[in-house]
Design a protein with these regions (language model features):
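Alpha-helical transmembrane segments and their immediate juxtamembrane cytosolic regions
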Residues: 1-373
Length: 373
């Protein structure tokens, strides 16, 4: 597995950009523009359907895949791997949690829920949610979920040796649906609900870890000709999943409400990231643009930082009479390049590169000397 796998970098980049697009294709409350006509919702929801093929689940699988590839090159013990992942993920997570706890108050006051947000920030229950669930901002849930998933990486290596175990993703997604159908009505209104739901999510998302490891196993064992022969059937299945996603989005366009009770949409949404990973694996032998590898290192920072500028856009445009299409274009054209600029600047600053995964945590000097610890 020596060398750079540009197809993986391309997926990382697509996943990072798609998260920006995903969040701009909803209104400031995270809803599908319910106050406008279906005709005005059409373009935003079409864009969202395409972008939502690369969910955060794709990021999770890429992270597992990269970890397993790194371990195949440089084996380490379990404790060393966990410490390394804690430094890489949880230290930036702590920084951005504190940042967004304060920064989020700006949007909260602008949209009239400042008192409620302030009450959350000054309560221990609020900080428990911030640190354990990542609910300080709508995108921060990804990091604690990923860290919890990576704790199971020794199990995933079984699928690297026996790729058929990748099908466990289907089993675990079925378990997720069944468990949530019990947990939500049983704990509705309880402060424990989000914690139990997150536990169910982490445990059942191990299926994505098995899927990622299976992809690595297939890549290692197959020839280019074999992977090319798989492309047609996998693409056909992917097209079917996309059709189910599109049909569910028709309902969203018509009603102005998200669809949560369509089983076909559930399976299409959660299996599409697996399909994308498999399709790109089958095309891994192609000559992918090398610039993707250079730019993909900023994907993590793009994911972490884009709400900074999206909040500014939403505040500036909150009283606008623009159509949803104009709004999302303006928000994206502002948010994406400004976030990229910020991440690039942080990456070039030794004291800030660690916050976006582009450098180590800066050494700390104790006492009068220059000894680094």
């Amino acid at each position: 597995m020596a060398g750079r796998h540009t197809w993986i970098d391309a997926l990382r980049l697509f996943a990072g950009i798609s998260m920006v697009g995903l969040h701009v294709t909803a209104d400031s409350n995270g809803q599908p523009f319910p106050e406008v006509s279906p005709q005005e919702r059409l373009v935003p929801m079409l864009l969202r359907t395409v972008l939502y093929t690369a969910r955060t689940e794709l990021f999770l699988m890429i992270s597992v895949l990269l970890l397993l590839m790194a371990l195949s090159r440089r084996p380490r013990g379990y404790n060393a791997v966990v410490r390394e992942q804690a430094r890489r993920l949880l230290v930036p997570f702590a920084f951005w949690t504190v940042f967004y706890a304060g920064y989020g108050l700006i949007k909260a006051h602008a949209f009239g829920y400042g008192d409620a947000e302030w009450a959350r920030v000054i309560s221990w229950q609020g900080w428990a949610g911030f640190l354990l669930l990542g609910d300080v901002k709508y995108h921060m849930h990804f990091i604690p979920t990923l860290f919890g998933l990576l704790l199971f990486y020794p199990l995933f290596r079984c699928a690297e040796k026996a790729p058929l175990l990748g099908l466990l993703v289907v089993v675990f997604l079925g378990m997720k649906s069944a468990l949530e159908a019990v947990v939500y009505p049983a704990l509705w209104g309880s402060e424990w609900l989000p914690y139990v739901v997150r536990l169910v999510k982490v445990l059942t998302y191990t299926g994505y870890g098995f899927a990622a490891a299976a992809v690595l196993g297939l890549w290692q064992r197959s020839t280019v000709a074999e992977r090319v022969s798989w492309l047609g059937p996998i693409a056909l299945i992917g097209a079917g999943l996309f059709a189910f996603k599109s049909w569910a989005m028709v309902t969203v366009v018509r009603t102005g409400h998200w669809v949560f009770d369509d089983p076909s949409a559930y399976w299409a949404d959660y299996l599409m990231p697996v399909g994308l990973l498999l399709i790109c694996m089958c095309l891994g032998h192609k000559s992918w643009p090398l610039w993707m590898s250079h730019v993909s290192k900023y994907a993590f920072g793009l994911y972490l930082c884009h709400p900074i500028f999206l909040d500014i856009a939403e505040i500036a445009l909150r009283d606008s009479a623009w159509s949803p299409t104009r709004l999302i274009c303006a928000e994206f054209l502002w948010t994406a390049p400004m976030t990229a600029l910020l991440v690039w600047m942080l990456g070039r600053w030794r004291g800030g590169a660690w916050t976006v995964g582009l450098g180590p945590f800066p050494p700390v000097a104790l006492g009068r000397g220059r000894q680094e610890v």
